[in-house]
C-alpha cells in the first residue's frame, strides 16, 4: 500500500519546544508548590494534555494552573522555541511532491499557530487538529481520525510521525503506519519499546523511507 499522507505531532517533533514546556511547568508548579518539583520531575508531563497532568496534581486547581502555565508559555514562547535540523526542508519537499500533510497535536490552537508562524511552517500544512477540535486526545484515535477525514485520507495510506508514545500508540489505534523520532527527550529506546514501523535520526530520513515504500 502506497503512502500519500503524513501526519505530524508538533512539540518535540517539528519544533523544539522542550525547554519552553519544562520551564512553563516549573514556573507553574513552583508558584503553587515552592521548590517541590525539579526538571526531571516534569519530564513525564510532556505528552499528556495539561488538563490530565494538572488533574493528577490537584483537581481543584486545574483551570487556574492551566492559566498560569499558558500565560508564562505565551510570554516566553519565541525566546525558548528552537528549530530542529532538516524539518523545514523536509516538510517543504513533502508538499512539493504532493503529499497531503497535517498536524495532530494536544496543544491549544493559539499556541500551535504561534509555533508554526515562528518556524515558518504555517504555509505548508493542509490541516491542523488541536485539542480545541476534539473530545479525546492521543493516544485515542479521534484526533488522527479527524485529520484523516479532513484530508480525505485512508489510515493505511498514512504515516504518523511523533516523539512520544501517545503519537505511536495513537497511530496504531487509528490504523496508520508509525514513525518515531530519535530526538525525543525521553530517549530512542523509550519509543522503540512501542514498536513504531520506522525510526528517524533526522527528519530528512523520512524522504528515502517514503521513496522505498512507494517504490
Swiss-Prot record:
Cofactor: Mg(2+)
Family matches, as PANTHER family: PHOSPHOGLYCOLATE PHOSPHATASE, PYROPHOSPHATASE PPAX
Cellular component aspect of the GO annotation: cytosol
Domain of life: Bacteria
Known role: Hydrolyzes pyrophosphate formed during P-Ser-HPr dephosphorylation by HPrK/P. Might play a role in controlling the intracellular pyrophosphate pool.
This protein's UniProt keywords: Hydrolase, Magnesium
EC number: 3.6.1.1
Catalytic center residues: 9 (nucleophile)
Keyword Transcription: no
Organism: Bacillus mycoides (strain KBAB4) (Bacillus weihenstephanensis)
Molecular-function annotations in GO: inorganic diphosphate phosphatase activity; magnesium ion binding; phosphoglycolate phosphatase activity
Taxonomic lineage from the root: Bacteria, Bacillati, Bacillota, Bacilli, Bacillales
Keyword Magnesium annotated: yes
Protein name per UniProt: Pyrophosphatase PpaX
Family: Belongs to the HAD-like hydrolase superfamily. PpaX family.
Classification via SUPFAM superfamilies: HAD-like (SSF56784)
UniProt GO BP: DNA repair
Catalyzed reaction equations: diphosphate + H2O = 2 phosphate + H(+)
Amino acid at each position: 500500500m502506497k503512502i500519500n499522507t503524513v501526519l505530524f505531532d508538533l512539540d518535540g517533533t517539528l519544533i523544539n519546544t522542550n525547554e519552553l514546556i519544562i520551564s512553563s511547568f516549573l514556573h507553574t508548579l513552583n508558584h503553587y508548590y515552592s521548590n517541590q518539583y525539579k526538571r526531571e520531575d516534569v519530564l513525564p508531563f510532556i505528552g499528556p494534555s495539561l488538563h490530565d497532568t494538572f488533574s493528577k496534581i490537584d483537581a481543584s486547581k486545574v483551570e487556574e494552573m492551566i492559566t498560569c502555565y499558558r500565560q508564562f508559555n505565551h510570554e516566553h514562547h519565541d525566546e525558548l522555541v528552537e528549530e530542529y535540523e532538516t524539518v523545514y526542508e523536509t516538510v517543504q519537499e513533502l508538499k512539493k511532491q504532493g503529499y497531503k500533510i497535517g498536524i495532530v497535536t494536544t496543544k491549544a490552537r493559539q499556541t500551535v499557530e504561534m509555533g508554526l508562524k515562528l518556524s515558518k511552517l504555517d504555509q505548508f500544512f493542509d490541516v491542523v487538529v488541536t485539542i480545541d477540535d476534539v473530545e479525546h486526545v492521543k493516544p485515542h484515535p479521534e484526533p488522527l481520525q479527524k485529520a484523516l477525514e479532513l484530508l480525505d485520507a485512508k489510515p493505511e495510506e498514512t504515516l504518523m510521525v511523533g516523539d512520544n508514545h501517545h503519537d505511536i500508540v495513537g497511530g496504531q489505534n487509528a490504523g496508520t503506519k508509525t514513525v518515531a523520532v530519535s530526538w525525543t527527550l525521553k530517549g530512542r529506546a523509550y519509543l522503540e519499546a512501542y514498536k513504531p514501523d520506522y525510526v528517524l535520526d533526522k527528519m530528512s530520513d523520512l524522504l528515502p523511507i517514503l521513496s522505498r515504500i512507494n517504490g
